[in-house]
Regions:
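Anion-recognition interface
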Residues: 1
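Alpha-carbonic anhydrase
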Residues: 4-7, 12, 23-271
Length: 271
């Protein structure tokens, strides 16, 4: 699987608007409707909001039937997936150009998100601007069938409407210094709404090992648009038990089940 996946140019302005407005949202401003949450991964429609959830009649199994704008949720290039790549990691031209910027804690209605526009991810010379990062517990992607307690998605968008999402797993261990200031306002959804902006640099979130699984996929929340270049890092980071409990106390089980790989290939690359 050394052939890098080819991505079709996508100009889905609606999908991008939904993603950038809130990659997953039940109301204008809700988060996790997609991996393009810019400022979230949530889907938010100003004129009409279609409720979706992670369980019951509005859960993942029925997303594609809730509204015609969600039909892509039944597509053939959906995310998340189980990550399995046996080949040796290949080098790819990716540049991280993150800068210190103001991050704002945001309650999407489906998860914890931080809206931040602080830098650029360049893939083969193409620029993707950082828009936000948000959390799923437990992880959405799995590795050889194994899940992690949490996963963060850093959502980036290009000028032509394509998304690049960087996924990082978390396991329980030492306290995470980068997340500590953010977690001070995670006592409840009310404290999230009243939180003051924080200065942060997304570069401080990245693990030392830049080996990633990469594949073409979609937003993991409605509208599930298939416009995402996924890069999921192989090395997990840690959170303390207290940090993990604070996160899951507000939102837990906000993960879409893994989707069929179909005819896609998963590459393992070093960034």
């Amino acid at each position: 699987m050394n052939t890098r996946p080819q991505f079709r140019p996508v100009l889905w302005i609606l999908a991008l608007a939904l993603v950038l407005t809130a990659c997953q949202t039940e109301t204008a401003g809700d988060e996790e409707a997609a991996e393009a949450d810019a400022p979230t991964e949530t889907a938010s429609v100003e004129s009409e909001t279609i409720a979706w959830d992670y369980t019951g009649e509005t859960g993942p199994a029925n997303w594609a039937e809730l509204n015609e704008t969600y039909e892509a949720c039944a597509g053939s290039r959906q995310s998340p997936i189980d990550l399995v790549a046996d080949d040796e990691a290949q080098d790819v031209n990716v540049e991280f150009d993150y800068t210190e910027a103001e991050g704002t804690l945001f309650d999407t209605g489906h998860g914890v998100q931080v809206n931040i526009e602080g830098g650029t991810l360049r893939i083969d010379g193409k620029a993707f601007a950082l828009k936000q990062f948000h959390f799923h517990t437990p992880s959405e992607h799995t590795v050889d069938g194994t899940s992690y307690p949490a996963e963060v998605h850093l959502v980036h968008a290009s000028d032509d409407g394509e998304l690049a999402v960087l996924g990082i797993f978390y396991e329980e261990g030492e306290a995470n210094d980068f997340l500590a200031p953010v977690w001070e306002d995670l006592e409840s959804r009310a404290t999230m709404a009243a939180a003051d902006p924080l200065m942060m640099n997304a570069a401080d979130m990245l693990p030392a090992d830049r080996t990633t699984y990469t594949y073409p996929g979609s937003l993991t929340t409605p509208p599930c648009s298939e416009i995402v270049r996924w890069h999921v890092m192989q090395e997990p980071l840690t959170m303390s038990a207290e940090q993990m409990e604070a996160l899951t106390a507000i939102y837990d089980d906000n993960n879409r089940p893994v989707q069929p790989l179909n005819d896609r290939e998963i590459d393992r690359v070093t960034l």
